[in-house]
Each structure stands twice: as structure tokens, then as C-alpha cells.
Regions:
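Short, surface-exposed basic-aromatic patches at helix termini and helix-loop junctions that form
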Residues: 133
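Class I (Rossmann-like) S-adenosyl-L-methionine-dependent methyltransferase catalytic domain
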Residues: 1-47, 54-102, 119-126, 130, ...
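A conserved beta-strand element that flanks and buttresses the S-adenosyl-L-methionine
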Residues: 111
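Hydrophobic adenine-recognition pocket in adenosine-nucleotide-binding enzymes
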Residues: 115
Length: 211
């Protein structure tokens, strides 16, 4: 699908209420919550950065932590502040923002839940570089994205080709990209996920590579 057509079709999802409704209907938040519950432990004093936090829905399943979320959509950030303002800090901006850079320093965990496939390759690398530079050496990058793989559900592959984000990669491509920034990758493939039967590739990435 051409980018202009995709942007027009999915324009309503830029509205926080529409976005939240779709997440609820498709079960996206439920699978993310299940992945975190099974594989990711948090300390109460941990600084957690949510890159592309959207409306802050990750706070529905995160335990109490020192939460920082950023997103370039001002409507999403306003909705997040209205609902979760007492539980963390929210900033409207992207990986190029100096304010974001200052706020995310010395993070223990970076989260990227279904964000990167909505970005260009250049923007994806900026997010990964931000995490690489701002994580503590003992920190981790939590990656959760749809991917194309050899065992995709037929409906899932069709839906992924029609996804709002136009940059879904193969499992090999995501793995190779992440390995440029992190030395240790713990991988979890989840399929089929959501009503749309996506294949989801999740990683817990550790040991940021030294620049």
C-alpha cells in the first residue's frame, strides 16, 4: 500500500480515543502485558523510558517504577498526562529532541512496544542509538514488534502487509539491526497474536555496544 493511501486510511488513529479503542479491540495491550509478566522483572527504583509511549497504556500493566514516556503526537501525550500523570513524566518529542535526551539519561530500561515499524529506517536507528547511549551499562532494551517470518499465519501476513506502520521487517532483519547496538539478545517469537494473527518478535536486549 502506498504511503499516502496508508496515511489517509489510518488518519483517525491519530486521535487518542480511536487509538485506544483499536488497541482494546485487537488485544494488543493484553499480549504486551502477558509478555512483560512472563519475561520482564522490574524494581521499584528502576528508571523506565517508554519510547513512543502513545497514550501511556503500558502503565496499565507496569508495576510502580520511575516512568518516563515520550511521543511526537501531542494528542497522545495530553491523553497520557490526563490519565496517568501521577505515575510518571510525559514529554511531547522524538529522539532528536534535546529535552528528551536530557530526560532519559541513565535509564535502566527502554521500552519500544510496537513503535519502530511505524518509523523510517533513519528514525528507527535514532531510537536505538538513543537507547544505546542513554542506558546504564547494566540496562536493557525491550523490543516488541510485528515481523515477517517463515511460519506466519496466512491471515496474519495479509494483515501485516496492510498495517498502519509501513516498515515491518523480517525476523532476520530485526535481529541483525538490534545486534548492531546490543551484544546480547534474548529472543521470543509469539504467534499468532491479536485478532489479526500477527507474528510478534520480542527481544530483551542487553549489553549496549560501546561507541
Amino acid at each position: 500500500m502506498a504511503k499516502a493511501s496508508r496515511d489517509t486510511l489510518y488518519a483517525p488513529l491519530r486521535l487518542p480515543r480511536v487509538y485506544n479503542l483499536l488497541q482494546s479491540l485487537t488485544g494488543g495491550s493484553r499480549d504486551r502485558a502477558d509478555f512483560v509478566k512472563r519475561h520482564v522483572l522490574f524494581r521499584s527504583d528502576e528508571k523506565v523510558v517508554d519510547a513512543g509511549c502513545g497514550t501511556g497504556s503500558a502503565l496499565e500493566f507496569l508495576p510502580p517504577v520511575k516512568y518516563v514516556g515520550f511521543d511526537p503526537n501531542s494528542g497522545y501525550i495530553h491523553a497520557a498526562q490526563s490519565r496517568y500523570g501521577s505515575r510518571g513524566q510525559f514529554l511531547c518529542g522524538d529522539a532528536d529532541s534535546s529535552e528528551v535526551w536530557e530526560l532519559v539519561q541513565s535509564a535502566d530500561t527502554f521500552l519500544s512496544f510496537g513503535v519502530l515499524h511505524h518509523l523510517t529506517d533513519s528514525q528507527i536507528r535514532k531510537i536505538l542509538s538513543l537507547a544505546q547511549r542513554c542506558l546504564r551499562q547494566s540496562g536493557r532494551f525491550i523490543f516488541y514488534e510485528p515481523c515477517f517470518s517463515a511460519r506466519d499465519d496466512v491471515l496474519g501476513r495479509i494483515c501485516m502487509n496492510l498495517d498502519r506502520g509501513g516498515n515491518i521487517k523480517t525476523d532476520q532483519a530485526w535481529r541483525a539491526l538490534l545486534s548492531e547496538y546490543f551484544a546480547t539478545l534474548e529472543e521470543h517469537l509469539r504467534r499468532p497474536v491479536y485478532w489479526f494473527r500477527y507474528t510478534i518478535q520480542a527481544f530483551i536486549c542487553r549489553d549496549p555496544r560501546q561507541l
